[in-house]
Amino acid sequence: MKKLYTIVSLMLSSLSIMATDFKDCSMAIKSNISTNIEKSNTTVFINRNTFSINGLKYDNTDLGNVELTNLQVINGYSDGTMVYATSEPQYITIGGEKVAANFRGEVRKSKFRGILNLTVNGSNYIAMIGDKADELGQLPNAGFENFHDASETSDTKEPNGWHSFKTCAGSLSGTAGKANNTFIESKEKHSGTNCVKVQSDILSVLGFIKQPANGTMTTGRLYAGSTTANNTANNSTMDFAATDKDGNGDPFYPIFTTKPDAMTVWVKFKGNVKDYPNATVNAILANDKVQDPEKDDYKKNVIARATNATIESKNFAWQELNIPFEYANKNTPKGMLVTISTNAKAGKASSDKKNLDVIYVDDIAMIYNSSLKSAQYKNTNLSFADNKAAIEIEGKANEADFSIASDGEGAYISKVLKTNEGETGKSTLYITITSNDLQKSNCFEVAITDKTATGIFNIKSDSNATSSTLYNLAGQQVSNSYKGIIIKNGKKYINK
């Protein structure tokens, strides 16, 4: 097994937070070179925008102490949560080796959780630190297993992290709050124990007017401010400055600072309005206050959107939706406003009390890409087989000579060039593409031969070249049966 160099130390704490120890944090380290998962408890130390951890181990190997500095601090949440992240790969020397590291973590309610992702010589290690660190980059309660009372005076259940009209605000909240929209569902779930059932309702307005109301839930807070259904005063809002708490003691917003490429969600839908047959799922990534339907005042805060407003019943069977995010800019998000409704049109719910619109929702997942989209050395395209490629160049290569692109919107790309020990004119470029949630990485290697040092000529990109590949003095690849002077691993031999 390769010698393991690992680091865990990164970010945390803003200039407003004092140096803090977080003791007895659970930790699990996994690697792409072994199926073993090393579990232990550890202490992390946070001082302003520096994160450090001591005494790391993997497979009974001491990994030492690590520290990362100059971390990005994301704050401004009314509940005091602090999020810390590397904005790009940081390069650290561990055991004499250059290591590429990425980190993301948060301090919330005096508890720490985070993910450290590092690569050394093509080997990738991921340390999950703290309770539910693997849920970073996902919405809370994404499987809809946990519910709470909407309020002290209501027995209506809301999924943890989600909110219905029972907790709405606005001038008409008294009327809208009579709607029963969300229910625990244990029989019709897609997986696990529960899912959520969202159902439309018919409200009594002024005691005698019957008004159909869409069944709606949101990660923000619903507002009822107009009798005109499509008025933007009727909306879902995400406001990080709002101090109100829901029935579970959580704010009316989710903390979400990553950049997913798509969102998948399982739904089972039945609409009962012929002219308005579609349900909708809409997600907005933002770094400040936003609402849905959007208002011009807040559009500048939008970073990305993911929308499906054409959800069909499809025989009332479970279906998986895959909704891509479209990014408007490169800003860092602070939260995600997700709104799910039984009808894509405001105020177009079923007027039949016996046939209300209903959508079951389960298993929401954020998808993060980390595949290689393209790779070039100057103007030469690189072709990879089994994540390896080989090129021959004139002179020594530089990391800046290589252009790497990923299919991940927020994927982190690191490049580490290393001279091969004992091999004249040979070096290896280690490329790592890490998903924005830091939970998966793809590692690539480029074997580089400096032909001016070895006598090899003719630049080419060869995805099949290995350490045993033979060349003649013209730089042509030859077989073992070739007679004459050959070059192997940068050294010349006479093959008889």
Predicted regions span which residues?
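Aromatic (Trp/Tyr/Phe) and Gly/Pro-enriched flexible surface segments
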Residues: 127-260, 277-287, 291-322, 326-327, ...
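Central antiparallel beta-sheet cores of small beta-barrel/beta-sandwich binding domains
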Residues: 36-98
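Bacterial Sec-dependent N-terminal signal peptides
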Residues: 1-24
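Extended, low-complexity, turn-rich repeat/linker tracts enriched in Gly/Pro/Ser/Thr and Asp/Glu
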Residues: 59-61, 269-277, 289-292
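Residue-level detector of functionally pivotal "anchor" positions at catalytic/ligand-binding pockets or at interdomain
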Residues: 369-374, 449-474
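Edge beta-strand at a domain terminus
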Residues: 19-31, 38-41, 63-77, 111-139, ...
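Beta-sheet ligand-binding and adhesion/scaffold domains
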Residues: 79-135, 218-234
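Beta-rich interaction/scaffold domains
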Residues: 369-453
